[in-house]
Amino acid sequence: MVLIRVLANLLILQLSYAQKSSKLVVGGDECNINEHPFLVLVYHDGYQCGGTLINEEWVLTAAHCDGKKMKLRFGLHSKNVPNKDKQTRVPKEKFFCLSSKYFIKWGKDIMLIRLNRPVNNSTHIAPLSLPSSPPSQNTVCNIMGWGTISPTKEIYPDVPHCANISILDHAVCRAFYPGLLEKSKTLCAGILEGGKDICQGDSGGPLICNGQIQGIVSVGGNPCAEPRVPAIYTKVFDHLDWIKSIIAGNTAATCPL
């Protein structure tokens, strides 16, 4: 049975196609403290996810990362020794592509969060650009997060880890995830030989290609980083109109079909 690495800490969700478990960055190295000013730690009720600051008031993450009493931490590198410019916010509003966040469909695992008040840009806090065009196959992209660094054990690092992976042919993911539609609004990315991957706790974090957020960590295999088992990312480019409409104040905007 295919396991979905719905990358939130032991967060088990019922999907419309299959049930799977979550994961984090495996096979990477500690990120440079200055290379992730847009990276957000999203947490609630003992669960953690990643997120991406796209402007001073808005964050992108995965729909399955939603929960009560959510907090978002900005300007964070070490969780135990925070930067002086760290900031914490809570959601003011949340927007989803689905009527229920508990039933995640391929390509609709996306949540747009409006913060209770804007963050202040600083040395370790700055937004990441939205995509100007979709990434092509074989593009080398970056993944990052505070997720577990072991494919089989829950070993959560104090600092975020980063790794480079590549955009793969959609058919590679369809071979492992039979419910994935040919034209779903997702990206397939990973390393075919295995060894580098997102893992538990990395859900909602960014897939960064050419300095832009192209994907949101959604689904993967269990255990993480297995050969020929890439992960699935919600494709941000296909949701640009929805994202921009919501931010502009059109809260009734609908997601692409």
UniProtKB/Swiss-Prot annotation:
An example Gene Ontology biological process: proteolysis
Keyword Secreted tagged: yes
GO molecular function: serine-type endopeptidase activity; toxin activity
EC number annotated for this UniProt entry: 3.4.21.-
Annotated compartments: Secreted
Residues bearing glycans: 120-121, 164
Pfam families linked to this entry: Trypsin
Peptidase S1 domain: residues covered: 25-248
Keyword presence, Protease: yes
Tissue: Expressed by the venom gland.
Main location as per UniProt: secreted
GO CC annotations on file: extracellular region; secretory granule
Function (record text): Snake venom serine protease that may act in the hemostasis system of the prey.
Self-association state and partner proteins as the record states: Monomer.
Name of the protein in its database record: Snake venom serine protease KN3
Organism: Trimeresurus stejnegeri
